[in-house]
């Protein structure tokens, strides 16, 4: 019956839209890459910074930046260089070195699989993306080494084997034993390894943001205690591994989170990023010989380093708006700042090697993509590419951007709102809140279609109001905004989301009797939190890969925001959803990948068990072969499942 009614509804919609523009299919919403704006990649020439290059098919085109004239067009030559010459690489759990002839030398030789060398550590927190760090002169290679002997294992079920089998992963749970990390340094000429003599804090410290000095003599490491409340920026001798000195320290009663390496201007000066001193992520200039740290970017906004020369530093800033990113320059001699990007929106830029030019790739709500080049003195700016709207053949609803005051009245939380096709303010429509809300995120930007997930438009085309809003705890509104969640994940986030829902439901066209919520990961945690704390508001929810109790989440992320059950028992009790299962009133579907190695299966299965104990009905759908994120054809199946659930119970 439901499918028959849906068919009738779709036929009616098709008649109503006789302009021949299409509706999204589920495959369009999930898999159609043609609905992403075309890109126009450019890069600055290494030989002549006044030239930019663009790959056009099988040729490289070179253009004069100022005139825009084509200077040359040459075939792309695909060489076959040996990738393993004069470099280190990983081999199983060890590091090896390949000399100029390609001969392989063992740097480490551990048979114990609990000791892993040359890979990222700390589960990729603190901006860590790799484990090998060659020195500028290539005479040394620093590398991470982690000992996971004491870390507990978690079993994942592999159904592809004949009788099923277990795959055990190392998973350091909150409050339990963590990995022990060291930094080794391989001396290429001597073919020897030394380890940095790190003695700060206990052995479960974090070693983050390794940076080489320009002269390759010193390694700088931002050493963080396990509680993540104190950081020491230390210098170590590359040859001996000996501790040299502590350059600076940071302390915070909530958390310190070093995420950025140092950027050296010369051997004596470097640029340093922190949000721990002035309430926002800002850039600072430290002079080693003087022991001084000077604030460079003096704005009440979060900034991010892009590049520098000896004369200037280039950075992104959110000072125009938290939902926009613009490129600025700052003179290192007189401190003068200049905005370089033009046009509203979200800008991603690169700087020429000599610092005279920049390339700008940006979009805004109704602008799919623009690529431009400009001069850093502000005198020149020229557009070189403008993309067409890839969705022009589809019947899209208008996307609205706006803001609602946070529950504490101090901030503007930004939202995107999508109303149904042929919207009539005198009708009532079901509402879906799509939520994430967790740290390091921003769901709403003034970029093309406001970072729309096409499934949202798919649902709007089928008669739903879709609402997405960022809350306290997310990015680009300063340290206080981001750290409001400390020791109580979910509290400030829910308060803000409810402030947004109060505003939304004040409109007569929003049906307060038909409100649903959907989210994944932290958004799954938020979905179940909202369903159980505000059952009178949310009638239907779909939660994916949800955190249920922070004691089952990983050490690095979980302890930063929640600390441990020992130090924060009240916070863990208040945020655990096990005790909230009895409050579930509406229809809830939980989906999760059965081999999820981020939010392990223990979370969602434990919540289902709590619902059984409480006598509360709940629906559950596992994806046996998927990890934390469900992709490809499995994602099409997932989002159809989500859609059907709302169609069945919220329509």
For each of these PLM feature ranges, what is it?
Residues 146-153, 161-293:
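Beta-propeller domains
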Residues 65-68, 99-102, 187-191, 238-241, ...:
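Short loop/turn segments that connect beta-strands within beta-propeller blades
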Residues 32, 68, 107-132, 143-196, ...:
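Predominantly five- to eight-bladed beta-propeller fold
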Residues 9-17:
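Hydrophobic h-region of N-terminal signal peptides that target proteins for export
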């Amino acid at each position: 019956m439901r499918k028959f009614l849906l068919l009738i509804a779709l036929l009616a919609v098709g008649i109503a839209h006789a302009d021949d523009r299409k509706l999204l299919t589920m495959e369009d919403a999930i898999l159609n890459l043609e609905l992403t704006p075309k890109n126009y990649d450019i890069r600055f020439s290494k030989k002549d910074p006044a030239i930019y290059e663009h790959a056009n098919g099988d040729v490289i085109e070179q253009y004069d930046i100022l005139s825009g004239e084509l200077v040359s067009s040459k075939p792309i030559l695909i060489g076959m260089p040996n990738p393993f010459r004069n470099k280190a690489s990983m081999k199983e759990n060890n590091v090896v070195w390949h000399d100029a002839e390609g001969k392989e030398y063992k740097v480490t030789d551990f048979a114990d699989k609990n000791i892993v060398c040359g890979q990222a550590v700390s589960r990729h927190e603190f901006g860590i993306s790799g484990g090998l760090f060659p020195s500028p002169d290539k005479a040394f290679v620093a590398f991470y080494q982690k000992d996971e002997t004491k870390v507990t294992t978690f079993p994942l079920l592999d159904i592809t084997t004949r009788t099923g089998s277990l795959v055990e992963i190392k998973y350091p749970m909150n409050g339990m034993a963590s990995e022990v990390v060291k930094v080794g340094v391989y001396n290429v000429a001597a073919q020897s390894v030394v380890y940095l003599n790190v003695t700060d804090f206990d052995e479960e410290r974090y070693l983050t943001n390794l940076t080489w000095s320009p002269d390759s003599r010193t390694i700088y490491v931002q050493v963080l205690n396990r509680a993540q409340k104190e950081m020491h920026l230390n210098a170590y001798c590359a040859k001996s591994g000996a501790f040299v000195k502590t350059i600076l320290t940071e302390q915070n009663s909530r958390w310190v989170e070093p995420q950025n390496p140092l950027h050296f201007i010369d051997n004596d000066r470097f640029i340093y990023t922190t949000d721990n001193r002035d309430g926002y992520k800002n850039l600072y200039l430290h002079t080693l010989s003087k022991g001084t740290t000077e604030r460079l970017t003096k704005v009440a906004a979060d900034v991010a380093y892009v590049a520098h020369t000896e004369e200037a530093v280039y950075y992104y800033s959110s000072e125009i708006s938290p939902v926009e990113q613009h490129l600025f320059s700052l003179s290192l001699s007189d401190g003068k700042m200049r905005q370089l990007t033009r046009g509203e929106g979200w800008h991603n830029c690169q700087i020429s090697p000599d610092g005279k030019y920049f390339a700008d790739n940006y979009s805004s709500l109704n602008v799919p993509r623009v690529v431009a080049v400009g001069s850093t003195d502000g005198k020149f700016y020229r557009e070189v590419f403008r993309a067409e709207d890839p969705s022009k053949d589809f019947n899209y609803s208008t996307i609205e951007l706006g803001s609602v005051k946070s529950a504490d009245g101090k901030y503007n939380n930004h939202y995107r709102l999508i109303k149904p096709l042929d919207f009539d303010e005198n009708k009532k429509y079901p509402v879906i809140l799509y939520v994430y809300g967790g740290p390091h995120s921003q769901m709403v930007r003034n970029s093309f279609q406001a970072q729309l997930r096409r499934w949202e438009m798919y649902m709007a085309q089928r008669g739903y109001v879709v609402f997405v809003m960022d809350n306290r705890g997310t990015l680009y509104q300063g340290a206080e905004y981001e750290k409001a969640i400390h020791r109580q994940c979910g509290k400030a986030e829910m308060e803000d989301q409810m402030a947004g829902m109060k505003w939304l439901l004040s409109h007569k066209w929003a049906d307060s009797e038909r409100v649903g919520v959907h989210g994944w990961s932290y958004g799954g945690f938020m979905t179940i939190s909202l369903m159980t704390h505000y059952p009178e508001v949310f009638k239907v929810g779909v939660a994916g890969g949800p955190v249920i109790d922070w004691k089952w989440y990983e050490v690095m992320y979980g302890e930063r925001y929640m600390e441990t059950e020992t130090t924060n028992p009240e916070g863990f009790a208040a945020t655990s959803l096990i005790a909230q299962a009895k409050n579930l009133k509406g229809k809830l579907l939980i989906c999760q990948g059965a081999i999820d190695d981020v939010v392990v299966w223990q979370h969602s299965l434990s919540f289902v068990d709590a619902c059984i104990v409480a006598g509360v009905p709940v629906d559950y759908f596992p994806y046996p072969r998927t990890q934390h994120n469900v992709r490809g054809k499995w994602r099409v199946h997932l989002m159809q499942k989500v859609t059907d659930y709302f169609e069945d119970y919220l329509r």
